[in-house]
């Protein structure tokens, strides 16, 4: 420690070094980005493919399976799921956390290219991919409304102008639009008129397609000029298509308007969107993987004036939902907790040291240590988020510890009559090793966490590094700035001149004297204390096993997502009514600010809702409580269910689900899976530990199954392809031509008039032109009957899959829910051909359970190794670590008392306690060893004196750590659900360990000393006998 004497003798250099650390920290703070949590996004790529009119089973077998076989060969894929519905397939690839998203995207594109030859030839476009997780909630939702423009026109503005501009902004990963579709010319055919004219639907299709052609025509030129040839070969509006001649009957022209209604409409008329019960187009913006939410949102908000200016004045563009306000509010709450923690810690120091001069020294060390940490955070690529700021808040009680130990020891020498300079040199020499041991052993706690892979390791890496850097800067400050300031600021102050702290000092002295008397009794009854310590260890095990557990505290982000699941045979019109009814019910809740939703597209019986809650200051209930009371009202809506869940910043997995947790059933036998899934779902629905139980298996959709009489078809001269083309032309909203415009491309859509799609009897009016050009009714060669058929087909890996989703009732923990599910699966006797496994967050929870104890054990072993190296002893580290059981009991009991489940945040609190509570033992053992090795005191006298001498700094450091964590316990604003488990764990552990450690540590110290003495005497006895 002679090196640090240089800093005492060179105050200018020391102050400039401190200033440099602080300035670097200020610069780093200004450059740090802001986010709710560390970036822990799994690389996710979504592959989409479409085949108009294809059934879900066709999409699964002809499109999804070839894609899955090719994509499944990519390295680093942790999960591959697919969903095939009417005309569309989506394959979601979730990669390992260490997989580079850009490299994965290149592999995905190569796999799509390899599978291209295996895909159906009728696909209008190649499969595409996006580097975005479709199950993530949007970071921002914009709405377009107008009293003059139609939904299709609004959708066109959103797609053509807004989507393109927003997609180019930094941080934006995907822009999806809901509520309608692009404008189109729709041709609604009258099959009766066509039959009377002897015109087939395919003839109409060909006539329209041939009338709208775009191709190069060439040019004409002479020696002087050049002319580009241009024709009117393109038709762009319904008015242009209506007079089109499609057939001649007995020499008379039959125009399109004679057999159809032609109008300017939209590509898919079965779409609806609403914002607060008003028709609207929703623009849903999702961030790119690893993009910063605040930066992304700020970029969009900054562009809003430009976006509004690009739209007609009659169109209103509003921000319906924004993730950033609650993030900013949460971070402001943490920053406030940090300031309160610093103030409380400085107050503790003043009460103990009774001098503003002495208090100013740690009061300077604390902000320098914390501010300097920002520089390291910036260099490491971290952000200002809830966890990193929580680390700094907790660090407030740690960074002052080193300064307190040095300051208190120097103050003790000055009070004994030593000059300040000499006291500083002597004091830092005496406790330098103690401070080093305390800091290094605390940092050692986080080494296993830094080496841990997976989500927990990535999630808490910033927390561990931030806290470790703050502690190391604190160590440097305590050995340089603190003794230098002590040498120049501290003076021996008569106790009589401190009237304001005399009362506190008398209390502290009485406590110290009482502690001394009780310690003597404890040392004389050491056996009972050792039994108490063993009982504490056993109690730890029992509490850990019995305490409710969850993966990550459920956040109240002020946003909720809703998923509507209606009867599988519901029509689009009825589904739109359900959406309106549900939005009305949700909007009526006093805690709800606004509601937006849409339905339609490829999933006819489902819809999505996005709900914004009022700020926490304006509502007296949590998001989960809002869901609980809405659940009762929503259950009264017949024929449909609305499942609500709070939006979370951490969502694991890529499967889109109607609830927060999933259990997936897999089988290679689709029929057996469809047999067992309803039984398992029904059993899950009866469990009180689960709520909102639902499944993505939808195999009861209404389907009209046509059976061709092939003999009759051959006799009538009709091919299967001609019959299929009839059905596709009539009912498939078939896109038969393309309209090219400067900013976008639009379609011509053909189907029979809506009047002929409302009832099955319309099939009687359908006909095919045979090889003899005669109209043959469909009923001549086909029969039909209604059956059940799947609305979607799901795969996971290459197996058929059904995912049962569920939420947790208020007050239920995830460990109870998973245990109940496992018991139910065992009791049902599910065959081995049907496999069940947790997915998404529930799967991550189960995986974390198996690693938590290993992580705690690794932290303890790491601390033991570091202490063993520092003390050159196998025994003294055990004495120091004997403080841990009491801290564990206190932490777990505190969680039980507050009704908080044991989560990853609480686990970090336990690991922090491993580093905190051993500080007290280090201070005792260090002084006892010095006294004992000097030969002046016995082991019992040495540890007794050490306990009394270090009583004041032990109380100071413990209270500092306790008050540093106390604001996290008492917080109640945005993000409190994240901060409270950490504060509860630390405060509970500190309170319990403070009471017990003061007695168990000296007893364990003497126990090991006696063992060592016995071992030494045994060889001497053997030598005397020989």
Curated annotation (Swiss-Prot):
Membrane-spanning parts: 12-34, 336-353, 360-382, 431-450, 463-485, 525-547, 853-875, 895-917, 948-970, 985-1007
Keyword entries, A-Z: Cell inner membrane, Cell membrane, Membrane, Transmembrane, Transmembrane helix, Transport
Subcellular location field: Cell inner membrane
Annotated GO CC locations: plasma membrane
Single annotated GO MF: xenobiotic transmembrane transporter activity
Pfam family, one: ACR_tran
Quaternary structure, from the entry: Part of a tripartite efflux system composed of MdtA, MdtB and MdtC. MdtC forms a heteromultimer with MdtB.
UniProt-recorded name of the protein: Multidrug resistance protein MdtC
Gene (name only): mdtC
């Amino acid at each position: 420690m002679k090196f640090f004497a240089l800093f005492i003798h060179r105050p200018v250099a020391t102050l400039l070094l401190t200033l440099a650390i602080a300035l670097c920290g200020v610069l780093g703070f200004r450059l740090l980005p802001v986010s709710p949590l560390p970036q822990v996004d799994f690389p996710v790529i979504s592959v989409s493919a479409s085949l108009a009119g294809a059934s879900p089973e066709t999409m699964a077998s002809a499109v999804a399976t070839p894609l899955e076989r090719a994509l499944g060969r990519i390295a680093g894929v942790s999960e591959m799921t697919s969903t095939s519905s009417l005309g569309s397939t989506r394959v979601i690839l979730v990669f390992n956390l260490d997989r580079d998203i850009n490299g994965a995207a290149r592999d995905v594109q190569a796999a799509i290219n390899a599978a291209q030859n295996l895909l159906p030839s009728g696909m209008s476009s190649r499969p595409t991919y996006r580097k975005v997780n479709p199950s993530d909630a949007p970071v921002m939702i914009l709405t377009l409304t107008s009293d003059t423009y139609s939904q299709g026109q609004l959708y066109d503005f959103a797609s053509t102008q807004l989507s393109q501009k927003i997609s180019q902004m930094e941080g934006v990963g995907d822009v999806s639009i809901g509520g309608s579709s692009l404008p189109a010319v729709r041709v609604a055919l009258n099959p009766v008129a066509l039959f009377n004219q002897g015109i087939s639907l395919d003839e109409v299709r060909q006539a329209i397609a041939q009338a709208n052609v775009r191709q190069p025509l060439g040019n004409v030129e002479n020696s002087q000029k050049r002319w580009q040839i241009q024709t009117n070969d393109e038709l762009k509006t319904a008015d242009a298509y209506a007079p089109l001649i499609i057939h001649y009957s007995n020499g008379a022209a039959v125009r399109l308007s004679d057999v159809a209604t032609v109008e300017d409409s939209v590509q898919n008329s079965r779409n609806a969107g609403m914002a607060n019960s008003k028709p609207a187009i929703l623009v849903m913006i999702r961030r790119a993987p690893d993009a910063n939410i605040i930066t992304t949102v700020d970029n969009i908000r900054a562009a809003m004036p430009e976006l509004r200016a690009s739209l007609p004045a009659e169109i209103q563009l509003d921000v319906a939902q924004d993730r950033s306000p609650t993030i900013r509010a949460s971070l402001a709450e943490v920053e406030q907790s940090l300031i309160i923690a610093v103030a409380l810690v400085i107050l503790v120091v003043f009460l103990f040291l009774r001098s503003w001069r002495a208090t100013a020294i740690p009061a300077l060390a604390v902000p320098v240590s914390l501010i300097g940490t920002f520089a390291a955070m910036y260099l490491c690529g971290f952000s200002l988020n809830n966890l990193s700021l929580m680390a700094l808040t907790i660090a407030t009680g740690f960074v002052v510890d080193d300064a307190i130990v040095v300051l208190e020891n120097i103050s003790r020498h000055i009070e004994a009559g030593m000059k300040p300079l000499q006291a500083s040199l002597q004091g830092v020499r005496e406790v330098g090793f103690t401070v080093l041991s305390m800091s290094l052993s605390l940092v050692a706690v986080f080494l296993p966490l830094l080496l841990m892979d997976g989500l927990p390791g990535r999630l808490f890496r910033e927390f561990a590094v931030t806290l470790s850097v703050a502690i190391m800067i604190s160590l440097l400050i305590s050995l340089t700035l603190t003794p230098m300031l002590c040498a120049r600021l501290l003076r021996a102050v008569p106790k009589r001149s401190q009237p304001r702290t005399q009362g506190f000092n008398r209390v502290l002295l009485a406590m110290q004297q009482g502690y001394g008397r009780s310690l003597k009794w404890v040392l004389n009854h050491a056996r009972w204390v050792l039994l108490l310590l063993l009982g504490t260890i056993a109690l730890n095990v029992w509490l850990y096993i019995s305490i409710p557990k969850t993966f990550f505290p459920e956040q109240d982000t002020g946003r909720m997502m809703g998923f509507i699941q209606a009867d599988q045979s519901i029509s689009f019109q009825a589904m739109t009514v359900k959406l309106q009814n549900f939005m009305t019910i949700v909007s009526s809740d006093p805690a709800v600010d606004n509601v937006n939703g849409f339905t339609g597209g490829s999933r006819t019986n489902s819809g999505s809702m996005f709900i914004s809650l009022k700020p926490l200051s304006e509502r007296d209930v949590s998001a989960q409580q809002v869901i609980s009371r809405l659940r009762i009202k929503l259950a009264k809506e017949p024929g449909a269910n609305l499942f609500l869940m709070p939006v979370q910043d951490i969502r694991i997995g890529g499967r889109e689900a109607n609830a927060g947790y999933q259990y997936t059933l897999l089988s290679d036998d689709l029929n057996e899976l469809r047999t067992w899934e309803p039984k398992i779902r029904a059993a899950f629905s009866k469990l009180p530990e689960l709520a909102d139980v639902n499944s993505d298996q939808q195999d009861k959709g209404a389907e009209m199954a046509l059976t061709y009489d092939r003999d009759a078809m051959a006799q009538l001269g009709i091919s299967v392809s001609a019959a299929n083309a009839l059905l596709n032309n009539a009912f498939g909203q078939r896109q038969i031509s393309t309209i090219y415009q400067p900013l976008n491309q639009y379609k011509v859509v053909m189907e029979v008039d809506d009047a002929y799609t409302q009832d099955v009897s319309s099939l009687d009016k359908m006909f095919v032109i045979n090889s003899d050009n005669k109209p043959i009714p469909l009923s001549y060669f086909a029969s039909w009957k209604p059956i059940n058929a799947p609305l979607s087909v799901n795969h996971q890996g290459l197996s058929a899959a059904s995912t049962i989703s569920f939420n947790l009732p208020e007050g239920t923990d995830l460990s109870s829910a998973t245990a109940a599910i496992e018991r139910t699966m065992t009791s049902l006797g599910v065959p081995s051909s049907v496999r069940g496994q947790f997915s998404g967050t529930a799967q991550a929870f189960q995986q974390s359970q198996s690693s938590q104890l290993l992580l705690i054990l690794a932290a303890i072993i790491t601390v033991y190794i570091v202490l063993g190296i520092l003390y050159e002893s196998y025994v003294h580290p055990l004495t120091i670590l004997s403080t841990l059981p009491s801290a564990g009991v206190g932490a777990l009991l505190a969680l039980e008392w507050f009704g908080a489940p044991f989560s990853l945040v609480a686990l970090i609190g336990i690991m922090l306690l491993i580093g905190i509570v051993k500080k007290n033992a280090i201070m005792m053992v260090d002084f006892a060893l010095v006294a004992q090795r000097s030969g002046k005191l016995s082991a019992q006298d040495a540890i007794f004196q050490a306990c009394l001498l270090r009583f004041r700094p032990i109380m100071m450091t413990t209270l500092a750590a306790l008050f540093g964590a106390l604001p996290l316990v008492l917080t109640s604003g945005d993000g409190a659900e994240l901060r409270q488990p950490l504060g509860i764990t630390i405060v509970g552990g500190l309170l319990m360990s403070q009471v017990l450690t003061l007695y168990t540590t000296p007893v364990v110290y003497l126990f090991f000393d006696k063992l060592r003495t016995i071992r030494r005497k045994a060889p001497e006895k053997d030598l005397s006998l020989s």
